[in-house]
UniProtKB/Swiss-Prot annotation:
It is found in: Cytoplasm. ATP binds at G9, M10, S11, G12, G13, V14, D15, S16, M35, G124. One of its GO terms (biological process) is tRNA wobble position uridine thiolation. It comes from Burkholderia cenocepacia (strain HI2424). Its main location: cytoplasm. GO terms for molecular function: ATP binding; tRNA binding; tRNA-uridine 2-sulfurtransferase activity. CDD domains: MnmA_TRMU-like. The record marks H125, Q351 as: Interaction with tRNA. Its EC number is 2.8.1.13. Keywords: ATP-binding, Cytoplasm, Disulfide bond, Nucleotide-binding, RNA-binding, Transferase, tRNA processing, tRNA-binding. Belongs to the MnmA/TRMU family. One of its GO terms (cellular component) is cytoplasm. This is tRNA-specific 2-thiouridylase MnmA.
Amino acid sequence: MSKRRVVVGMSGGVDSSVTAWLLKEQGYDVVGLFMKNWEDDDDGEYCSTRQDWIDVVSVADLIGIDVEAVNFAAEYKDRVFAEFLREYSAGRTPNPDVLCNAEIKFKAFLDHAMSLDAEMIATGHYARVRERDGRFELLKAFDHTKDQSYFLHRLNQAQLSKTMFPLGEIPKTKVREIAAQIGLPNAKKKDSTGICFIGERPFRDFLNRYLPTKPGPMKTPDGKVVGEHIGLAFYTFGQRKGIGLGGSKSGSGEPWFVAAKDIASNTLYVVQGHDHPWLLSRELVAGNVSWVAGEPPADGFACGAKTRYRQADAACVFGGAATGAAAAGPAGEVRFSLAFDDAQWAVTPGQSAVLYDGEICLGGGIIESAATGQPGQATSAGHAPALAEAR
């Protein structure tokens, strides 16, 4: 009887290496697949994959599996990077890891794995898949400190039905122990941080290679000019560092934060104080929705939600139809709203709002706008809250 073939996405890191070893130990026919998603020619200094490939080959030799490399750089540029630039150009702050998982790691990679006669694919993500009543559920990892379901919320039933997450029930500390015990050559390799194509350089330097600077005024909510920004794309909501303002502009001494952008006037609005009303939101509207089960929760469903990675679930109520002044976005597009029990800090257009029912990840959407802590005010990627100077 032939063994079930599983193709493992191997990055050269500890997590995917231990994933491959665990599946081999469980008796699967394991094939490693290394994905090259960025061409070295595009940026040889920051994104060389040479060492990662060497690590993958070394691990494959140790545990006794075949491995191959596949180039998805063209798909990555078309499906992920182009959207990344479009979002920043529109004043939003996208999360390319979410799109990469949906379009590359669990679409292009999955399709290629099936061409290798695989029954399943596996990755080193910290999450779980459970089949119940004929449907597949995406669950948080047992190790909540490493849970990555937020980045996986756009996966659908077809993708989950072919996916395994062997590390979902193992603490990260145990994964490191396993790597050391079996003598993996990359056992002490640091976890990757950030986005591959950005590398370790300052994010602003990278973005400036693709988006032009367009300086404009930096204003307070009452319209006072306190500085000049280099371009709205280079700032994100809640940003504190890199603004170029001290605490002396108003004499309060409190730090400054980016609070809003107005694309039409090319104005960046900043406020002083972490808990300024312009930084606090009780409601949001999200579009470009995706539900793991293929359908949304019921209107009025009480759930938890994250508006950024590593955030604790925030209690909220789901609304299936976005209404009111905050309902920005293309006419006819399916959107949803969330009303939070407690005000959320720096809810950022372009990031994902991901819903949870306890351990179950329901799906989510891309944040389009958020109502601020002041009645009747909302902020979106291109519009600041109602301004004092305009009242």
